[in-house]
């Protein structure tokens, strides 16, 4: 006992003196002043600047540049005068493939040096201009389709010959089967299209055979098509969401109900429910062991090995390999053994953790409104994310369109007089000014980047990201401080519930906004700076991954690991600092120091008790998310059939996307509800440590903790002497 007391005194001297008894202290201090005013002013200035950036982006930006394709004159397809023509057709897709950067195409809408027209639907077959069309008396209206030609050309009334129309690129002289990908008509030469029997005999590019023509088009446009096909996958996923959103919402509602029921059960039967939870996880592990063993034995006659299978994206193939189930079996056995050993050696600490959770449950029983606060945090985070996304989109589409004179076919006539930087106006452009170059056209190139606002778009995007991260971290900090103040009001109420303040959550929220915006912004700023460094490291690692030598890669890995650990540590310190701010109203640095010293003086209790509680709450999340995930899997994969035609799984492109969405949403919902519990446990634990240091159980300095906690710690309050 003497050695233990000596170690405690040494820790106290190293990490500050224990908290002293204060007869006037009975919970969160009401008489407080504003803290970290400089950081508060800085945060307000950043928010004001963020609003200005959003307004400028809204004034200069136009999301239609990304949402809708454009024809050669820069007019949007699918809206305005082209409302019934949602897709864009490229006369010579080969020019797009050779002259277009893929990333620029995705952002700028795939503008390339060939005529583009808006069409109602993409061509679905092969077609090439007949040789008869080149005869002197051939009429263009007999060979071209009006819909596929530029709108200014009227085939019935034109005086142009077929050759002149081709040279001026007023109509396409060939097209292939195309598919509308993001409303762009891109070649679809897969499957039976490669069969020469399905291709007209006259279909070929000049100087090439049919097979050479197909090969040239396929090879030249493969990268372009694949790039837009990836975006098309996103549209297919969006279609799945449109078909299943009602069922996704239903799954999320079930997750919310299960989470609330779990918390209500935890309030009344915390010990029983937690032990059931622990043994339930062990039972799930045991079932997994049995299942893996059963499948392992059922494949005893299989000769399939990993060397036979090789690498494949088909996961089902690996499940047919016997060694796969053996690996699963070994892993589950190890995990099960570790859990059983932890349960045996930490059983006493688990009892203390249960007591903390019971105390938190009692607090929630008196402050049920705290369970609704995650909704406030979610709404504020949704506002931050929406504002960031909309601002980023408008910034990316800022700038007036730039048109330049381009020779679409330099082999026809003398086009040397056309300068590369010669701009034009598509409304007033007259091709007769370039009589020596019949293919001269006024073509949209890109958007203006020469103005003051446009030159700083990259810097504004960086500002957008930094302000977004700061706002998100501030919202989270506000939630921590608000909940901490409410739970601290409960703990430091000596006679519960009589001494609990009225509307403790609202009072705590108002105190945080009135006095501690600067302190919360200070903590959020520190975390934001670390997150920015991590983002930069991830970018550099991705940018130079191929060029790095082993030493550089090792150094980069070490830096990423160190800053990841630093971010986790800062989050831990911030969380406890916000608790101290909510209780005592000090500035961020003082609160962080006091919280850190208090935790270090009780490091054993912190590591064991607090983390055991976190582990138990994580198991609760796992149970909720796992149950909802299994239900979603059986439903969206068609294993649970609904009567009638209410829902058909076959109508989905990727049935796993709704499953992932439900699981992810269920995790967010469970995390929101359990975060209240987690914050309550952390706050009560910190108050509990302060209670042990401030008080000794005497009549003058009684403990504020519950009788259950005092019983576990062999503590008790002495009754005041009477008479």
Swiss-Prot record:
Phenotype seen when the gene is deleted: Morpholino knockdown of the protein causes abnormal numbers of small, fused, and misplaced otoliths, and a smaller inner ear. Neuromasts of the morphants are smaller, and the number of lateral line neuromasts in the morphants is fewer than in the wild-type. Fewer hair cells per neuromast are found in both the anterior and posterior line of morpholino knockdown larvae (120 hpf) than in the wild-type. Knockdown larvae have a defective balance system, they show an abnormal swimming behavior by remaining stationary and resting in abnormal positions, they swim up and down and in circles.
Alphabetical keyword list: Antiport, Cell membrane, Glycoprotein, Membrane, Transmembrane, Transmembrane helix, Transport
Glycosylation positions in this chain: 71, 202, 211, 219, 303, 409, 421, 430
InterPro entries per the UniProt record, alphabetical: Choline_transptr-like (IPR007603)
GO BP field: acetylcholine biosynthetic process; acetylcholine secretion; choline transport; neuromast hair cell development; otolith development; otolith formation; positive regulation of cell growth; thiamine pyrophosphate transmembrane transport
A cellular component annotation (GO) from this entry: apical plasma membrane
Extracellular side: 58-245, 291-325, 396-464, 538-578, 637-655
Keyword Cell membrane recorded: yes
Entry's localization field: Membrane; Apical cell membrane
Disulphide connectivity of cysteines: none
Membrane topology (UniProt): Multi-pass membrane protein
Side Cytoplasmic, residues: 1-36, 267-269, 347-374, 486-516, 600-615, 677-723
Main location per the UniProt record: membrane
UniProt keyword Transport, yes or no: yes
Spans traversing the lipid bilayer: 37-57, 246-266, 270-290, 326-346, 375-395, 465-485, 517-537, 579-599, 616-636, 656-676
Protein purpose: Choline transporter that seems to play a role in the choline-acetylcholine system and is required to the efferent innervation of hair cells in the olivocochlear bundle for the maintenance of physiological function of outer hair cells and the protection of hair cells from acoustic injury. Also described as a thiamine pyrophosphate transporter.
Name of the protein described by the UniProt record: Choline transporter-like protein 4
Organism: Danio rerio
Lineage: Eukaryota, Metazoa, Chordata, Craniata, Vertebrata
The encoding gene: slc44a4
């Amino acid at each position: 006992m003497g050695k233990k007391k000596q170690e405690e005194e040494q820790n106290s001297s190293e990490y500050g003196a224990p908290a002293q008894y204060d007869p006037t202290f009975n919970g969160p201090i009401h008489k407080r002043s504003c803290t970290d005013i400089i950081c508060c002013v800085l945060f307000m200035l950043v928010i004001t600047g963020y609003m200005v950036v959003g307004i400028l982006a809204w004034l200069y930006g136009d999301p239609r540049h990304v949402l809708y394709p454009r024809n050669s004159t820069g007019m949007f397809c699918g809206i305005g005068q082209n409302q019934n023509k949602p897709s864009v057709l490229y006369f010579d897709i080969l020019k797009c493939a050779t002259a277009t950067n893929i990333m620029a195409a995705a952002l700028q809408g795939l503008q390339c040096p060939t005529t583009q027209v808006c069409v109602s639907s993409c061509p679905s077959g092969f077609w090439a201009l007949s040789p008869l069309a080149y005869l002197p008396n051939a009429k263009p209206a007999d060979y071209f389709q009006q819909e596929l030609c530029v709108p200014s050309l009227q085939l019935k009334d034109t005086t142009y010959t077929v050759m002149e129309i081709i040279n001026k690129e007023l109509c396409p002289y060939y097209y292939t089967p195309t598919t509308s990908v993001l409303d762009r008509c891109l070649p679809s030469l897969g499957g039976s299209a490669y069969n020469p029997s399905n291709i007209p005999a006259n279909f070929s590019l000049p100087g090439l055979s049919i097979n050479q023509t197909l090969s040239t088009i396929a090879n030249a446009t493969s990268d372009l098509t694949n790039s837009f096909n990836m975006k098309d996958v996103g549209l297919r996923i969006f279609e799945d969401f449109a078909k299943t959103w009602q069922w996704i919402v239903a799954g999320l509602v079930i997750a919310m109900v299960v989470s609330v029921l779990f918390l209500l059960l935890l309030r009344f039967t915390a010990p029983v429910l937690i032990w059931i939870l622990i043994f339930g996880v062990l039972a799930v592990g045991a079932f997994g062991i049995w299942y893996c063993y059963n499948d392992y034995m059922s494949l005893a006659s299989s000769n399939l090995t990993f060397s036979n299978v090789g690498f494949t994206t088909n996961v089902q193939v690996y499940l047919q390999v016997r060694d796969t189930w053996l690996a699963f079996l070994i892993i589950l056995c190890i995990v099960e053994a570790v859990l059983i050993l932890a349960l045996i050696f930490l059983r006493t600490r688990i009892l203390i953790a249960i007591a903390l959770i019971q105390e938190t449950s009692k607090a929630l029983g008196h402050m049920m409104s705290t369970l609704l606060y995650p909704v406030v945090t979610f709404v504020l985070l949704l506002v931050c994310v929406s504002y960031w996304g909309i601002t980023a989109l408008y910034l990316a589409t800022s700038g007036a369109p730039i048109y330049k004179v381009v020779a679409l076919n330099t082999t026809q006539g003398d086009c040397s007089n056309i300068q590369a930087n010669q701009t034009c106006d598509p409304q007033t452009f007259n091709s007769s000014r370039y009589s020596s170059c019949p293919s001269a056209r006024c073509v949209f190139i890109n958007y203006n980047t020469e103005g003051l606002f446009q030159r700083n778009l990259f810097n504004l995007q960086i500002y957008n990201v930094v302000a977004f991260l700061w706002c998100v971290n501030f919202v989270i900090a506000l939630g921590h401080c608000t909940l901490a103040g409410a739970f601290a009001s409960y703990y430091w109420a000596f006679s519960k519930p009589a001494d609990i303040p009225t509307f403790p959550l609202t009072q705590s929220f108002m105190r945080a906004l009135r006095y501690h915006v600067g302190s919360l912004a200070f903590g959020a700023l520190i975390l934001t700076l670390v997150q920015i460094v991590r983002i930069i490291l991830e970018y550099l690692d991705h940018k130079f991954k191929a060029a790095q030598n082993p030493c550089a890669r090792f150094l980069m890995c070490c830096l990423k690991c160190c800053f990841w650990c630093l971010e986790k540590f800062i989050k831990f310190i911030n969380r406890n600092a916000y608790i101290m701010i909510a209780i005592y109203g000090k500035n961020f640095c003082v609160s962080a120091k006091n919280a850190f010293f208090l935790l270090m003086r009780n490091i054993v209790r912190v590591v064991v008790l607090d983390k055991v509680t976190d582990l138990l709450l994580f198991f609760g999340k796992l149970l909720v998310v796992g149950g909802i995930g299994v239900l979603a899997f059986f439903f969206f994969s068609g294993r649970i059939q609904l009567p009638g035609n209410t829902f058909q799984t076959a109508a989905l492109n990727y049935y796993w996307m709704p499953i992932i969405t439900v699981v992810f949403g269920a995790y967010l919902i469970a995390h929101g509800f359990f975060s209240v519990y987690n914050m309550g446990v952390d706050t009560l634990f910190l108050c509990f440590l302060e209670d042990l240091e401030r008080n000794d159980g005497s009549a003058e300095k009684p403990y504020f903790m519950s009788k259950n906690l005092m019983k576990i710690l062999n503590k008790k309050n002495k009754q005041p002497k009477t008479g």
